[in-house]
C-alpha cells in the first residue's frame, strides 16, 4: 500500500476492475460517503488491499508502510457506521455485474437464485452485538456454537455465481448479547439488527423481492430441505418466480386422486420411470396451500436403497 493518493492504492490490474465495475459509484449510490476526513472510497480501497497484504489493520499500522495511513479508529468508524447501506451497495454492484455477464452468455441459459445458510462462528467472542448460541445443522458436526447463522442469496447461470444479499441471523431465545441501545432506530443498521432477530423464512421473501426489484433476471429459486416448506414456497411463488428444492419427509400433505398423503405415501403413488436409472418416480400433485407441484424421486447416491425427493412449482419441467 502506498501513500501517493487515491489512484495509487490498487495495482493496475485491480484498478481496472474497480473502474470497469464502477465500485466507487456504487458506494456513493448506497449513501456510503463522508463530508470530511479520508473519503469512503479511499478507506474502501485500503481495506480491499489488506487481502493481498495478508495483514489486518493493526499489523499494517505497525509496518513500515504505516506513514500517512488513517488510524484504526477511522477504519472502525467506517466499517461500523449504521448509516451506511452496505446491503444496497452489494445488491447494486452485483446487479450491475450480472448485466455485464448476461450480455456475454446465451440468453436461453436458465438463471436461478440460490438460497443457503451456513454457520458463522465467533466462539472466542464475548461482547459481539447480538451474539447467540446457535445449532449447526448445515454440516456433519451437528453441534452448538457461538456466533450467527449466515443466510445468503446468490445468482447463477450455471457457470457464474454472484452474491446478491446476506443476513446474519441471531436468536431471541438463545441470545447472549442484545442490540446496542445507542444505535439510531431510523438507520438501516438498526433495521438489519431487528432483521437478525427474526427467522430465515421471514427474511427470504424480502431478499428475493429486493433482488428482483433491482433488475436481476432469474426464473427459479433453488433451496435445500430446510427452506422447502409450503408457506415459504407460496410466498416466493406469489412474486412470480418458481421454486425448485429438496423435500424431506415431514407431515406436509399432498393431494393425489382426492386423497391427502405424506411424502412416503406419495412415493408409492408416483409413476415409475424407466428412462434413467437414477430417476425412480415422478408425480404431479397439489400442496395443502393449493399450489400445483411436480415431485421427482431420485436415487440417493450415498445409499442406493433410499430415495430423495425434489419438488418444482414449474410442472412443465422434465424429470432430468
Protein language model features and the residues they cover:
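Single, function-defining residue in the core of a domain
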Residues: 1-36, 44, 108-111, 126-127, ...
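Gly/serine-rich nucleotide phosphate-binding loop at the start of the catalytic core
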Residues: 1-87
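Active-site-proximal, Lys/Arg-enriched surface segment
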Residues: 27, 81-173
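Short low-polarity hydrophobic stretches
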Residues: 46, 60-61, 116, 153, ...
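Hydrophobic, Leu/Ile/Phe/Ala-enriched alpha-helical segments that form helix-helix packing faces
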Residues: 50, 97-101, 105, 208-215
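Short, charged/polar micro-motifs that form catalytic or ligand-binding hotspots
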Residues: 50-51, 65, 139-143, 194-197, ...
